[in-house]
UniProtKB/Swiss-Prot annotation:
Top EC group: isomerase
A GO biological-process term: protein refolding
Assembly behavior: Forms a cylinder of 14 subunits composed of two heptameric rings stacked back-to-back. Interacts with the co-chaperonin GroES.
Protein task: Together with its co-chaperonin GroES, plays an essential role in assisting protein folding. The GroEL-GroES system forms a nano-cage that allows encapsulation of the non-native substrate proteins and provides a physical environment optimized to promote and accelerate protein folding.
Gene Ontology CC, one term: cytoplasm
Record-given protein name: Chaperonin GroEL 2
Gene3D superfamilies: GroEL (3.50.7.10), GroEL-like equatorial domain (1.10.560.10), TCP-1-like chaperonin intermediate domain (3.30.260.10)
Any Pfam family matching the protein: Cpn60_TCP1
Annotated localization: Cytoplasm
Family: Belongs to the chaperonin (HSP60) family.
CDD domains assigned to the protein according to its UniProt record, in alphabetical order: GroEL
Record gene name: groEL2
Length: 540
């Protein structure tokens, strides 16, 4: 077993605090509209230039093992905040550093760390309630664009494209971010349900120019097994032909005689038809077939529902205004499903999302919700160089998460003002003893930290800015982008309540752990000279 190096009390805490400060000082330069860039070396290729706090945090590993513990603890604050709220990582890091630094002064003065933590937790609980009071809901295109712009380091173009995407696919729709092929940002929207399976045979194509099969006012047959015998399909084919409507067949596979007959019918123009494989595998395939069934008003023909293909009727088929089938994907637009059943299905999948343990499962379930509830929008990020593309994509991603958070829980005045205003709720708050009161005062002081850093990064004197903001009330604050004071909500300087709340919660949680740490254990450094010494038996 490797020998361990153990440090106790002040020796343990001081090394951890050094690590906290190194990481926080590197991250906090990115805070605010006038935040500075951080250049990160890469083993291969050009360095990365970023203003994204969590990207900076993830890169930091310190040589000293004990200091590195502190850095990794604060890195957890940034990562957890990013996971829950998608933004606010830099604010969380700044708050954590402020609480740790203030707390360490009191611990050094001989106060009880556990009582300090109780006071901190009590104060944070009150501040969170105050933030909910300050919060207001958002819904308009302009408000959504403002939140997106702020989170993308004051980039109005990014805010606008995110607001456009949300308007197109709804607040539940999937919005993905990809590399663009031009210099400008572009928005592509896929309406309806899209899944990644294309036509089984290219002979189903009815638009040679676009290499696709388009079926208008189509009937849709869903089957969870392979179809190889044409006799099983005949009743449905005859019914579709009599109804004079095109037919989309979604099955595990269509092969042999059945496929040949469908191809001949399509080529001769007897029946407009296209066949595609069902999306997904195993249980996920069954669930997705059921999603399509609910969206289109169909019944899945399967043993589980007691339905047989040769006994299927027109009542078992779904329908959609338009179906587009390409080589690799199929889009069902404007399905005829019952709205109440679609809503119930979405709610059911949301419950599964809350219970999902793996990120992969959660992501796939969210995609299913989006396909049922709205659609899919793709933001293609344009840039001149690859370095700029990476930096811009990080900002778009942050802005997207922040905007979703704002729609979910509302907004508060930005620029660190909401936290400053929330301090009013702590004025009369008392703990059970003097040490807990000190814990409350630690939070009171730490709530200034984000505004101090924003002002400092903008080249202004933090104490002067804070004094000026405290003279006003409500939404009155400091707009670092313009250097002016005024109503921040009017000026579009807002933060999602969820982001501010999560940042404070995580910062206080981790800072409390640092303050109550009394011992640290790390691998002892290896004695390289002893390892390099030659063996005397070898006769050197």
């Amino acid at each position: 077993m490797t020998a361990k190096d153990v440090k106790f009390r002040d020796g343990a805490r001081s090394q951890i605090v050094k690590g906290v400060n190194v990481l926080a000082d590197a991250v906090k330069v990115t805070l605010g509209p006038k935040g500075r860039n951080v250049v990160i070396e890469r083993s291969f290729g050009a360095p990365v230039i970023t203003k994204d706090g969590v990207s900076v945090a993830k890169e930091i590993e310190l040589k000293d093992r004990f200091e590195n513990m502190g850095a990794q603890i604060v890195k957890q604050v940034a990562s957890k905040t990013a996971d829950v709220a998608g933004d606010g990582t830099t604010t969380a890091t700044v708050l954590a550093q402020a609480i740790v630094q203030e707390g360490m002064k009191h611990v050094a003065a001989g106060m009880n760390p556990m009582d300090l933590k109780r006071g901190i937790d009590k104060a944070v609980g009150v501040v969170l309630e105050e933030l909910r009071t300050l919060s207001r809901p958002i819904s308009t295109h302009k408000e959504i664009a403002q939140v997106g712009a702020i989170s993308a380091n004051a980039d109005d173009a990014i805010g606008k494209i995110i607001a456009d995407a949300m308007e197109k696919v709804g607040k539940e729709g999937v919005i993905t971010v990809e590399d663009g092929k031009s210099l400008d940002n572009e928005l592509d929207v896929v309406e309806g349900m899209q899944f990644d399976r294309g036509y089984i045979s290219p002979y189903f194509i009815n638009d040679p120019e676009k290499q696709a099969a388009y079926l208008d006012d189509a009937l849709i047959l869903l089957h969870d097994k392979k179809i190889s015998n044409i006799r099983d399909l005949l009743p449905i084919l005859e019914a579709a032909s009599k109804a004079g409507k095109p037919l989309l067949i979604v099955a595990e596979d269509v092969e042999a005689e059945a496929l040949a007959t469908l191809v001949v019918n399509a080529m001769r123009g007897i029946l407009k038809v296209a066949a595609v494989k069902a999306p997904g595998f195993g249980d996920r395939r069954k669930a997705m077939l059921e999603d399509i069934a609910i969206l289109t008003g169909a019944t899945v023909i399967s043993e589980e529902t007691g339905k047989q293909l040769d006994k299927a009727t027109l009542d078992d088929l779904g329908s959609a205004k338009r179906v587009e089938v390409r080589k690799d994907d199929t889009i069902i637009i404007d399905g005829a499903g019952d709205a109440a059943r679609i809503d119930a299905r979405v709610k059911s999948i949301r419950v599964q999302i809350d219970e999902a343990t793996s990120d992969y499962d959660r992501e796939k379930l969210q995609e299913r919700v989006a396909k049922l509830a709205g659609g899919v929008a793709v933001i293609k990020v344009g840039a001149v160089t690859e370095v700029e593309m990476k930096e811009k994509k990080d900002r778009v991603d942050d802005a997207l998460h922040a905007t979703r958070a704002a729609v979910e829980e509302g907004i508060v005045p930005g620029g660190g003002v909401a936290l400053l205003r929330a301090r009013a709720a702590l004025t009369d708050l008392k703990g059970a003893n003097g040490d807990q009161d000190a814990g409350i005062r630690i939070v009171l002081r730490a709530l200034e930290a984000p505004l101090r850093v924003i002002a400092s990064n903008a080249g202004d004197e933090p104490s002067v800015v804070i004094a000026k903001v405290l003279e006003g009330s409500g939404n009155f604050g400091y707009n670092a982008a313009t250097g002016e004071y005024g109503d921040l909500v009017e000026a579009g300087v807002v933060d999602p309540t969820k982001v501010t709340r999560t940042a404070l919660q995580n910062a206080a949680s981790i800072a409390g752990l640092v303050l109550t740490t009394d011992a640290t254990v790390a691998d002892a450094p290896k004695d390289e000279r002893a390892e390099a010494a030659p063996s005397p038996e070898l006769g050197y």
